[in-house]
């Protein structure tokens, strides 16, 4: 399932889509404005689709602004006219804009009608989405030739739609997440936590400056943890969980990603979701911090002593169990959401 941005088409836009599917238009340019899909340009056909293509499509593409273009072919299938779906995401556009358009792509296809879309073309430069670029794309689909960079990026976007989060990689960018720089004091606080000189570090994203900054390092006991979770904004939390398990005293680092539902803006939700994995990779690889559990919550009320203990020591992995105990009643606390790393997922599969 792709990441949901909450952006939808208005009734006016849906009416334009209906007229387009009936053959009235050769091209539609769609943008995202004020968290809505809007049609910025409609063009009726002038000639054959090949003769219309470059003169219709290329002038609409801006150097620093992503958009979608729906271009109608002259061919039809059982549902009506067939269309090319063009996702334009230029190299010099803002990372946040790229993420937003990538996250909303599946929504637009659904609103327009996926059965009408014959081909999808993804481009970062105009050559990718020109008529020549489209024909190269068709050739690549019918042969085992290596994919172009743009085609490979489209393939990765499709893979991510089937998985969970939307993505784009660092501030140098791949499709695995956005690695915003970590401020010096935030990094130093994480170092102190790894050495157990601190027991709690809270980080936030400075959206304006695209940086992960330090928010809180207040000494925190387990009973204090719920009070550290903001009710109106997202945060990352690293907590040194001190507890006993089967007679052993343990100090385990737990990562908590708090996202208070839809009280946060779409942009904030997307940024926190996309920056999460690269941040954890830095913490685990560069700082050699062993993050024992990764948890996602909506609010601090979930962080009870029993909840945290059960997350760190799931009953199905409990040791020294002399006989198989019957399962407790289902749904006692609802479904817990864990952010599983690759190693955990592999262990679960085994």
Curated annotation (Swiss-Prot):
Keyword Repeat: yes
CDD domains named among the record's database cross-references: ADF_Twf-C_like (cd11284), ADF_Twf-N_like (cd11285)
The keyword Isomerase belongs to this UniProt entry's keyword annotation: no
GO CC annotations, alphabetized: actin cytoskeleton; cell-cell junction; cytosol; filopodium; myofibril; perinuclear region of cytoplasm
Positions of the ADF-H domain: 2-139, 175-313
Post-translational events: Phosphorylated on serine and threonine residues.
Residue list for modification Phosphothreonine: 349
GO biological process assignments: barbed-end actin filament capping; negative regulation of actin filament polymerization; positive regulation of cardiac muscle hypertrophy
N-acetylserine modifications at: 2
PROSITE patterns attached to this UniProt entry: ADF_H
Positions bearing Phosphotyrosine: 309
Subunit structure: Interacts with G-actin; ADP-actin form and capping protein (CP). May also be able to interact with TWF2 and phosphoinositides, PI(4,5)P2. When bound to PI(4,5)P2, it is down-regulated. Interacts with ACTG1.
Name of the protein in question: Twinfilin-1
Protein species of origin: Mus musculus
Higher taxonomy: Eukaryota, Metazoa, Chordata, Craniata, Vertebrata
């Amino acid at each position: 399932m792709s990441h949901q941005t909450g952006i939808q088409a208005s009734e006016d836009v849906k009416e334009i889509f209906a007229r387009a599917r009936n053959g009235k238009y050769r091209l539609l340019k769609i943008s995202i404005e004020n968290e809505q899909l809007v049609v910025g340009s409609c063009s009726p056909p002038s000639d054959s689709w090949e003769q219309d293509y470059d003169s219709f499509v290329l002038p609409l593409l801006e150097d620093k602004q992503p958009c979608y273009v729906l271009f109608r072919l002259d061919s039809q299938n059982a549902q009506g006219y067939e269309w090319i779906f063009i996702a334009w995401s230029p190299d010099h556009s803002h990372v946040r804009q790229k993420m937003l358009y990538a996250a909303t792509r599946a929504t637009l296809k659904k609103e327009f009608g996926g059965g009408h879309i014959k081909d999808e073309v993804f481009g970062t430069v105009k050559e990718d989405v020109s008529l020549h670029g489209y024909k190269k794309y068709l050739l690549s689909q019918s042969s085992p030739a290596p994919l172009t960079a743009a085609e490979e990026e489209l393939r990765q976007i499709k893979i991510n739609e089937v998985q969970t989060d939307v993505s784009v990689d660092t501030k140098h960018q791949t499709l695995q997440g956005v690695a915003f720089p970590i401020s010096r004091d935030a990094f130093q606080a994480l170092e102190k936590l790894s050495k157990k000189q601190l027991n709690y570090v809270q980080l936030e994203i400075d959206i304006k400056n695209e940086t992960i900054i330090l928010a809180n390092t207040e000494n925190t006991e387990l009973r204090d943890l719920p009070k550290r979770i903001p009710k109106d904004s997202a945060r990352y939390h690293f907590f040194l969980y001190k507890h006993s398990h089967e007679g052993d005293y343990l100090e385990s680092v737990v990562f908590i990603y708090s996202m208070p539902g839809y009280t946060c803006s779409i942009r904030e939700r997307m940024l926190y979701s996309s920056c999460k994995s690269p941040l954890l990779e830095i913490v685990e690889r560069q700082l050699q911090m062993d993050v024992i559990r990764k948890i996602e919550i909506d609010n601090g009320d979930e962080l009870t002593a029993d909840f945290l203990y059960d997350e760190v020591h799931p009953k199905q992995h409990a040791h020294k169990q002399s006989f198989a105990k019957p399962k407790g009643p289902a749904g006692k606390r609802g479904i817990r959401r864990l952010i599983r790393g690759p190693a955990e997922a592999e262990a679960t599969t085994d």
